[in-house]
Amino acid sequence: MDTKYKDDLFRKYVQFHEGKVDTTPGNQQPGSDEYLRVAAATLLSLHKVDPLYRFRLIQFYEVVESSLRSLSSSSLSALHCAFSMLETMAINLFLFPWKKEFRSIKTYTGPFVYYVKSTLLEKDIRAILRFMGYEPELGTVYKLKELVESLQVKMVSFELFLAKVECEQMLGIHSQVKDKGYSELDVVAERKGSTEDARGCSDALRRRAESREHLTTSMARVALQKSASERAAKDYYKPRVTKPSRSVDAYDSYWESRKPPSKASLSLRKEPLAMDVGEDLKDEIIRPSPSLLAMSSSPHGSPDDLSSISSINGLGLLRSTYFSTQDDVDLYTDSEPRATYRRQDALRPDVWLVKNDTHPIYHKRSPPTKESALSKCQNCGLSCSSSLCQRCDSVLVCPSASKPSAFPSKASVHDSLAHGAPMREKYVGHQTQGLDRLAPVHSKPKPSTTATSRCGFCNRAGATNTCTQCSKVSCDACLGAYHYDPCCRKSELHKFLPNSQLNYKSAPFSQLVYR
């Protein structure tokens, strides 16, 4: 700060107030100190001047900051009034030092309490009054010392005048930037650390506010773009499965949890029921039960037979549609799906039947009647009308009429083949009782059909060999052709044995056949 300019302003300030006291007619002084205020504002706004040199005796910015932080009633306008009142005390002291009323200051009076004590801290008030020569006495009164330094009192009064003008400038800056969210304390901090004038401080605060708003807007835009991209990514990777897919293994539990249809509801159907449970498993087929084999041996199986098979199956699920046993289809070469099979083909009056699988000899016969239907022995292949084979005395397996439960036919077949003759007779007795029990329900007697197995390679009837590892069945013709086909269960070759040499001590779920 220019010292010469400040000293010149100090002399004009002292002359202005001393001229008020001089009542001589030739000494005329202006009645307003407006020119002093303008000169003081220019002094405080000099460019590139350190803020520490604006005030010499009073630490103005520290006093204002502590008051604004500590006292809720303090503000820049209140500080302006407080500095103006202290300036008046200093002016009266250096103009009228002999008057007794100015030799003491009572701090409990109304103006002092309202304008000074409610705005400035007690320590700052004590420091300013000590610069003027007052010392505290009895806690509520300040007494003037015997010796009063008139020059120091004038300098303190001039500092208080500059403090009053600086408060006016900071109020002007705050009025320009308060719409940007700045407080009076922010203005004081900016003015304390800036070497610019009042206009430069207000422009700096505005630029800082605009940059902060721009940064906030940019951050909000980035956050919105990020949230939008996250939502788009979630929508892109969101699984769009509205219902369980029938071709995915993960939803097998969905189909297993469904309740099997009751036997009564299936018996009311007039057409053969074919329930599609999804795509067939690639390397697994279900070994048909004896009752299903008995039904499939006749091309004219009734819907009642199919309903009884569905009830025996337990789950009520069939793997394919119903077709005749004489429909020789190779599972490895046939390109036409089995679903295209028409039931009208099976209901034709003239049906060509195969008599021998090894050397095919076809003969034409009329549809069999219920009286002429015979059962074929699984061991020797002889057709018999009774429940016992006339050649090898083996029990002929008939469809079971028991209740629908999970895999009931498996236990009955294995029990009848694993135990001796007493168990076989007992099994036949139970089957007879079951058929007698079903007689009132179905008015028509059921035909006795042959129970033969289909080959797991060519799907032809007459499978007489079974693999001891994976339970896959094969006919004599495919046994030589596919003997070296690897067994998928243990990655070894198949070990086929004739059915007559099997002891039927199989593991659970022996109806599963793996290809």
Curated annotation (Swiss-Prot):
Protein's GO biological process: necroptotic process; protein K63-linked deubiquitination; protein linear deubiquitination; regulation of inflammatory response; regulation of necroptotic process; regulation of tumor necrosis factor-mediated signaling pathway; seminiferous tubule development; spermatogenesis
GO cellular component, as recorded: cytoplasm; fibrillar center; nucleoplasm
One MF term in the entry's GO annotations: signaling receptor complex adaptor activity
Tissues of expression: Widely expressed, with highest expression in testis, lung and intestine, and lower expression in brain, heart and spleen. Present at high level in Sertoli cells: expressed from stage I to stage XII of the testis seminiferous epithelium (at protein level).
Disruption phenotype: Mice are fertile and healthy with no obvious abnormalities in major organs in normal conditions. Males however display a decreased fertility: they show reduced testis size and sperm number. The proliferation of germ cells in the seminiferous tubules is decreased in male gonads. Impaired necroptosis: deficient cells show resistance to RIPK1-dependent apoptosis and necroptosis and are partially protected against RIPK1-independent apoptosis.
Region listing for Disordered, in residue ranges: 429-452
Location(s), subcellular: Cytoplasm; Nucleus
Pfam families, per the entry: SPATA2_PUB-like
Keywords, alphabetical: Cytoplasm, Necrosis, Nucleus
Residue numbers covered by motif PIM motif: 321-338
Residue intervals of the PUB domain: 78-150
Subunit structure, as described in the record: Interacts (via the PIM motif) with RNF31/HOIP (via the PUB domain); the interaction is direct. Interacts (via the PUB domain) with CYLD; the interaction is direct.
Job description of the protein: Bridging factor that mediates the recruitment of CYLD to the LUBAC complex, thereby regulating TNF-alpha-induced necroptosis. Acts as a direct binding intermediate that bridges RNF31/HOIP, the catalytic subunit of the LUBAC complex, and the deubiquitinase (CYLD), thereby recruiting CYLD to the TNF-R1 signaling complex (TNF-RSC). Required to activate the 'Met-1'- (linear) and 'Lys-63'-linked deubiquitinase activities of CYLD. Controls the kinase activity of RIPK1 and TNF-alpha-induced necroptosis by promoting 'Met-1'-linked deubiquitination of RIPK1 by CYLD.
Entry's family note: Belongs to the SPATA2 family.
Protein name per Swiss-Prot or TrEMBL: Spermatogenesis-associated protein 2
Organism: Mus musculus (Mouse)
